[in-house]
Structure formats: structure tokens, C-alpha cells
Curated annotation (Swiss-Prot):
Entry keyword annotation includes NADP: no
Positions with a binding annotation for S-adenosyl-L-methionine: R39, R65, D83, D109, A110
Enzyme class of the recorded protein, top EC level: transferase
Function: Dimethylates a single guanine residue at position 26 of a number of tRNAs using S-adenosyl-L-methionine as donor of the methyl groups.
PANTHER family named among the record's database cross-references: N 2 ,N 2 -DIMETHYLGUANOSINE TRNA METHYLTRANSFERASE, TRNA (GUANINE(26)-N(2))-DIMETHYLTRANSFERASE
Gene Ontology MF: a single term: tRNA binding
Any one Pfam family match given in the protein's UniProt record, by short name: TRM
Native source species: Pyrobaculum neutrophilum (strain DSM 2338 / JCM 9278 / NBRC 100436 / V24Sta) (Thermoproteus neutrophilus)
Gene: trm1
The name this protein goes by in its record: tRNA (guanine(26)-N(2))-dimethyltransferase
Every Trm1 methyltransferase domain range: 4-350
Amino acid sequence: MNLVLRREGAVQFYAPDPQRYGSIYSAPVFYNPAMEKNRTLSVLLLRTLGGGLTVCEPLSGTGVRGIRYAVESKAVARLVLNDISRDAAELIKKNLELNGVDGEVYNDDANVLLHRLKNVCDVVDIDPFGSPAPYIHAAFRALRDEGLLCATATDTAVLVGRYPRKCLRRYWSTVRKTPFYIELGLRNLVGFIARVAASEDFSIRPLMSYWEGHYFRTCVAVARGARDADDALQNVGYVVYRRGMRQTTQLPDESSSGPLWLGPLGDPLIMHQMAQHGVYSDFLGVLEQEYSIEAPWHYRLPEFAVEGVSPTLAEALDLLRRSGIYATATHMAKDGFKADAGYGEVKRALF
């Protein structure tokens, strides 16, 4: 295997040479440099939550995510890395040694490993190529009470409903076409995890959920207990969208998307604490503001255009705030904003 030495965050590691293999997708071991932000934000989250953690990454690739957790978060007591590829497992060992990190390395099927680690892990991070859905049940088997589950999904087109049959088959949900389809896709992922959690008698509380171009990412605190699982399911339901109207419901109809997570997508306080580290602080600041608004949707400026002309985002936010409506930009659309008011009230404030 042809390798190159790379650096990300505070670690160095070997990865397949993309020039030799043509693309990252053709290489014998997968490493995607475009996921650096994903990994960095995850490190900041663990650093914020505290130490002494048993962390498992069952789809490790080069091992860079787990190694960064160990080196940068200062929160890892035991690190378990795994990949079904024998080449990947050997490369993980090489990268652990390069960084002086102690870790257990396995060459196994991810679900088999997670079942073997029953009730062992404080953190399970599912970072697959495609959908995390096949691994979520097993992840809950591996998690301890009061643990953390992180999941990345790159099958964004499925989650936003572009492929309805696959969305129903994979996530047991339907997502309609709306101006805020990105948010529905993210809530689709979190809602799926919440329902799987409940089937394993776990509740979830999202700490950080976001969209970044080609993927969705969520990290949820989990707690064991049937009663808490029942309570968490109160945050699962449907979003109804018709022109000029948005509402939530517990029963589906021909205009609804769901079942989705209707509750908060993250914790504003944790985002504020993460931002203090000075890395991706602007992005974390946007998330902090978004998470403080309960509505499970956002608005887009073209929805309020008159003769094809709509206010700028800055103008819209100013008008809303002058009308006493709390509003903030959203990271999910450059022309989008969240507001603690209904469509009619927002429209009256803008015009």
C-alpha cells in the first residue's frame, strides 16, 4: 500500500496516497480529508463533556478520528478501534504507534464487535460510508447508561426524501418536498435514532446536530430507562407543510413528513462552551442561536418575495427583531432563518 504522511489537528498519520490510487474512494483504506471539520467538532465535544471515557469507533479507516480523540480531547481512558479491512486494521496499529497512543485494534464486522462490547462503551461513534442505519441497534447494545452516540450520514439524498422508497425502507419515514428540506433530513436522522433508542429502552437528548454540504451529523446523549424512552418519543412526530402554513402533528397525512425528531437539535450551552476553544467558533455560535428556537423548521427568504424581490437576510432579521420576534440565521440555508413565530406573523413583520 502506497502511503503518505498527513497531519490533522494535533496528530500525524499515514493514509493511502490519493495520487497513486486516483481518488480516496479507490484507495484500499478510506480517509476523507473533507471530514476534518466533522472530526474537529467531535473532539471539541468530548473535550467539553469530560474525561475517563471508553470510546469505540467501529468503522475506523485510518484511525485518525479515534487517535485525535485520544490526543486532543484529553477525555479518553480506553480507545477501541476497528475496521473490517485487514489493511485498515494494520494501518491503524501503525498510526497509533506513530502518535504514542494506546488502543485496542480489531479486524471485525462492526456489528459483531459492538454486540461483543455490550454495556462497555461511554462513546460510540458511527462514521460510515453512506448510512449509519445498519449499525444503530448494535451501537445501543454497546453503550452504557448515560453514554454518547455520534453518527454521520452521507446518504443525504435519501434522508431528505429524494428517494422515497429507500427513505421508507432505511429510515421508516417519508419526507415531502419543502423549502426547509435540509432540516427535515437532519430531523429524519435524529428521529430514526430516537426510535431505535426507544426500542432498546434508551432515551436520547441531542447535544449537537448539523448539516455540512454532503453529510448530516448528530451526537446524542443517551440514558437507559423505559419511562425516559417513552418521554423522549413525545419529541417524535410529523411536520405538515402547505404554502403559507407549517405545523406539527402526531398523525400523518398527505402533506406531512415523518416520523421526525421535533425537539431541540442540540444544546445551546454546550455549543457556547465548545466555542470557547477558538476553533469553528462562528459556526458553533450559529448553532447555539439556532438551538434556542424550538420550531422544527426554518424559513427561506424567497417564500416572502414580492414580485420576485425579497429582503436580504440582515434586513429580514432586523425587521423581525423590531417586531419582537426572536430570529436568527440558520446554517442550513444561506437565505434561511429560524424564528419563534408562525408564517403569518413573520410575513406581517417583513411587509
